[in-house]
Amino acid sequence: MNKKLIENFCSLSVLNITNYIFPVVIIPFLTNRLGSESYGRYAFSLSIIHYFILIIQYGFDLSATRDIALHSEHYYRQNIYSTVMFIKLVFNILFITFLVLMISVIPLMNSDGILYIYGVGIIVGQTLCPFWFFQGIEKMKFITIANFVIRLIPLLLIILYVKDSADGKYVMLFQSIGFMAGMLFSMLVVRFEFKLKFVIPQKKMIQTQ
């Protein structure tokens, strides 16, 4: 059996196990420590955050993964990587600005504004994490490692510092820290392992994405 296939299979297996185990551990812990009301407010805020993530991610990861898989040349991969990251960065700025406006005008969101502000790191970390690149080059181990970082850091911080319902806002903050750490790790791998630099893309490259 192909070595790369075995490696990717093992990486995906570990990834799926990780994605299953961490929620099983953390959700009962949070409901117990925060209580139903505080946990409900956190969960509602997180759902809004994920809507923004879905909008920013929409279509990009599939098309970008395909483009990376079709082009093995360093020059083209660097252009694709830079273009996708640039567009996502612009979208992050626009949608985070819109989120701040929503917080200021919608009373339900305004009352828990700090949750959304702390959740901005989740939006940035998840949308700018180049998992699509690793999928395109079939290097799933880096996704598994980054995902483990994303899951482990919040878990440890939550267990150490979340004591009661007043700490609900910190759950969002700790998750943001985890996503930002995973994003940073992934970007460093792209930069130093695969020697891809971020360059301002040409207008025609932006239009093709």
Role assignments for model-derived ranges:
Residues M1-L5, K141, G168-Q175, L184-Q209:
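Interhelical loop/hinge segments that connect adjacent transmembrane helices in multipass membrane
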Residues N16, Y20, S47-H50, N92, ...:
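Residue-level recognition of pore/gate-forming positions within transmembrane alpha-helices
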Residues L34-S45, H71-T83, I93-V124, D164-M172:
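Membrane-interface helix-capping segments at transmembrane helix termini in multi-pass transporters
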Residues Q57-S72:
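Helix-loop junctions and terminal segments of transmembrane helices
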Residues G113, I117-V120, I145-F192:
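Hydrophobic alpha-helical transmembrane segments
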